[in-house]
């Protein structure tokens, strides 16, 4: 457990260093945004269901006219984000968290647009990679790539470029790959257009 925690702390720190997003909240309880209606669902005219939970980590990046937000949920198992599961309502956790975070940020930044940048799982792990005579720096790059965030990234250039500044090719941080011409590759990318978020 100690080795996995140590590796995860290193990887999470590196992921933050690669971009300009900063943690804005840890263990953000829905009760902290008690007056929000985003987690309330009307079942019928008389009954309401209230969703409760905690957002493991909420990162933001503020610009002159917008606040970008990404949600990260820590997982110890092999949970992976599947867009089809989201479509069929089987994997709603990250979307519910994003909606709650966006509602909270709208109250905190009333004059700014709140822009979803991504919803991600981070798998707590200490993966083994093949060294094949590579130097330590290359090995660490492989490990970071194995631990990259898993989820859905906004294909808005401003969003993904700020999560992995200087990105060329396959990101070690987010599920996104760029072609040589700088366009987003369909292979190695799990993303949607900003309007679809």
Regions found by a protein language model. Give the residues of each.
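Structural signature of nuclease core domains in nucleic-acid processing machines
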Residues: 1-197
């Amino acid at each position: 457990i100690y080795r996995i925690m140590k590796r995860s702390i290193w990887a999470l720190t590196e992921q933050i260093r690669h971009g300009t997003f900063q943690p804005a909240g840890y263990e953000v309880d829905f009760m902290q945004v008690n007056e929000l209606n985003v987690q309330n669902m009307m079942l019928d005219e008389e009954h309401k269901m209230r969703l409760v939970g905690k957002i493991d980590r909420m990162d933001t990046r503020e610009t002159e006219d917008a606040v970008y937000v990404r949600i990260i949920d820590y997982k110890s198992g092999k949970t992976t984000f599947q867009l089809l599961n989201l479509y069929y309502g089987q994997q709603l956790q990250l979307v519910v968290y994003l909606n709650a975070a966006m509602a909270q940020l709208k109250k905190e930044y009333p004059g700014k647009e709140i822009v979803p940048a991504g919803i991600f799982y981070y798998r707590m792990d200490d993966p083994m990679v093949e060294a094949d005579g590579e130097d330590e720096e290359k090995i660490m790059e492989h490990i970071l790539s194995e631990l990259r965030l898993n989820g859905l990234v906004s294909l808005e250039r401003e969003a993904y470029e700020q999560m992995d500044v200087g990105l060329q090719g396959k990101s070690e941080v987010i599920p996104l790959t760029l072609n040589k011409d700088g366009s987003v590759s369909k292979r190695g990318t799990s993303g949607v257009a900003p309007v679809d978020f």
